[in-house]
Amino acid sequence: MTSLDFSTILPEVVLAGYALAALMAGAYLGKDRLARTLLWVTVAAFLVVAAMVGLGNHVDGAAFHGMFIDDGFSRFAKVVTLVAAAGVLAMSADYMQRRNMLRFEFPIIVALAVLGMMFMVSAGDLLTLYMGLELQSLALYVVAAMRRDSVRSSEAGLKYFVLGSLSSGLLLYGASLVYGFAGTTGFEGIISTIEAGHLSLGVLFGLVFMLVGLSFKVSAVPFHMWTPDVYEGSPTPVTAFFATAPKVAAMALIARLVFDAFGHVIGDWSQIVAALAVMSMFLGSIAGIGQTNIKRLMAYSSIAHMGFALVGLAAGTAIGVQNMLLYMTIYAVMNIGTFAFILSMERDGVPVTDLAALNRFAWTDPVKALAMLVLMFSLAGVPPTLGFFAKFGVLTAAVDAGMGWLAVLGVIASVIGAFYYLRIVYYMYFGGESEGMTSRMGAVQYLALMVPALAMLVGAISMFGVDSAAGRAAETLVGPVAAIEQPAEAAQAEPVQGE
């Protein structure tokens, strides 16, 4: 390892060093006595590493012979992932302490999961991709089953582990096919092989299997089966984490793989991604209608939103990737605010997740109800909230790429999905007489609700440079907008060239 390699992976080294030091400190200095302190130190560590990544004077480069890539795309995804993880940990502190759930291992395992996510988005090789993905997955299996005294939590962890192992096997099988037919595991080598005209059927099959394995991580249909049960059974802070940082990292990883390794066959993979997007948008929108548990409802919401993000990716253009990154950023912010509210829901000191508990909540706490209304409108894509512009961006990218049919289906799915978000608003403002709930929040949790709600309104006016940062990140991965051939045009041009 050279000094250049070390400087390239310095943020990851810092986070890994912190996680190991915290693990040793917790084991030797009194375990759960340090739990709350370790949680807040972990939040600080995430923010420090995010500052190192986002504010440092970086030069795009690679380490370990191209296995690890440091560029604008990876830095943007890392900052969003780190800040989202910090937000979830911070808003969960009071809740976990009140429920006697806070253990010193929790923030450390989350830190290790985030470390895996950082490697995922910087992967330049199939081996790095798998290493980062498994580091994240193994940590998430543990936190899903964190409540060992809860049958539902143990069940959630087991389901996630079994289906996660299956997806990892499919991913490995696809990677082995690509390696066998391309002769290399490096993304640069794979795309060079394809560019030289050696695109075999085996490589395409390998790509399909890898996309199947990665679709599990973003809960894309038909690989979403684990999501509702795991979201409902896991402790609510863990569900909040599942719904934010891992989704951002996994979507960024898919973008990294398809553009860096398979960027010359956009016409081949964009149709697969588009099919996943359509199925996810519609199943998430329709299946969520009949849900009565808000955590389970948010699981189907997550499935639908991943479908919309995949629309931007299916466009196969820099503007599509830019809007996908913006969509995932806005999605993470919306979910932090929504889960801050869900964490506060209780009746007689006991957490509740039943939608009926929201009946006439606006009458008892109008400020929090208004914040939740804004977040629900944004999740539904109602103008003028930021969620509307996020959906508009990815659908516009699809139209520009010659995939107008995909945009039309996206609009239909969005209209269907708006029902269950607006139903929550209906319960809060016009629900029937029933035993209600109280909303108990600490100061940090209150901020975690109010700041995202305010951002959904203010962001419609100005995103304070986040949109331009996403644009630069997309151009780093894909290239300038003008230099990108549209997938539909590429697919039509290929047969002509062969004649």
Curated annotation (Swiss-Prot):
| Enzyme class, UniProt record, top EC level | translocase
Topology relative to the membrane, per the entry? Multi-pass membrane protein
* Catalyzed chemical reaction(s): a quinone + NADH + 5 H(+)(in) = a quinol + NAD(+) + 4 H(+)(out)
| An annotated GO BP | ATP synthesis coupled electron transport
Pfam families the record matches? Proton_antipo_M
- InterPro entries assigned to the protein according to its UniProt record, in alphabetical order: NADH-Q_OxRdtase_suN/2, ND/Mrp_TM
* Source domain of life: Bacteria
The reply to whether Cell membrane figures as a keyword in the UniProt entry is yes
Q: Where in the cell is it found?
A: Cell inner membrane
Q: Keywords in UniProt for this one?
A: Cell inner membrane, Cell membrane, Membrane, NAD, Quinone, Translocase, Transmembrane, Transmembrane helix, Ubiquinone
What family does the database annotate? Belongs to the complex I subunit 2 family.
In Swiss-Prot or TrEMBL terms, this protein is called NADH-quinone oxidoreductase subunit N
Which gene carries the instructions for this protein?
nuoN
